[in-house]
UniProtKB/Swiss-Prot annotation:
GO terms for cellular component: mitochondrial intermembrane space; mitochondrial matrix. Residues 1-36 form a transit peptide. The keyword DNA repair does not apply. Disruption phenotype: Reduces the SdhB protein level resulting in an approximate 50% reduction in SDH enzymatic activity. This is Succinate dehydrogenase assembly factor 3, mitochondrial. It comes from the Eukaryota. InterPro entries: SDHAF3/Sdh7 (IPR008381). Interacts with SdhB within an SdhA-SdhB subcomplex. Pfam families: Complex1_LYR_2 (PF13233). Keywords: Chaperone, Mitochondrion, Transit peptide.
Length: 120
């Protein structure tokens, strides 16, 4: 069977392929991070089902970058880094919407296993 080029796939097929690839990569994470990551990815992909084309392009680019980063960090291609995650540039945080900052903060707390002030 010949390999299908990404350019031959429809947009929904590319989205599904990226989604499935990320979930497969998460199999290499510790169990608690895998569950957190899988839920987050599922929610984000659902949330962006009906976004405009410009947002969709940015969404796909950023998630493809995430997949590439986690591939390197898990050592699937090349030498493993031995650590997961990366620092977020303060300029990037400044560009986020308020709800995105809250979501990022909640994700950080969940990843560290810390409860917020509301006991969540």
């Amino acid at each position: 069977m010949s390999r299908i080029l990404m350019s031959q796939l429809t947009h929904p097929q590319r989205v599904r392929l990226l989604y499935k690839t990320i979930l497969r990569l998460h199999r290499g994470l510790p169990a608690e991070l895998r569950a957190l990551g899988d839920n987050y990815v599922r929610d984000e992909f659902r949330r962006h089902l009906k976004c405009n084309p410009m947002e969709a392009q940015l969404f796909m680019t950023e998630w493809a970058r995430y997949a590439s980063t986690i591939t390197q960090q898990l050592g699937i291609r090349g030498k493993p880094k031995g650590e997961l995650g990366e620092e977020i540039d303060p300029k990037t945080v400044e560009m986020l919407k308020d709800d995105q900052v809250v979501q990022l903060y909640e994700l950080m707390l969940a990843a560290k296993g810390v409860e917020d002030a509301q006991g969540k």
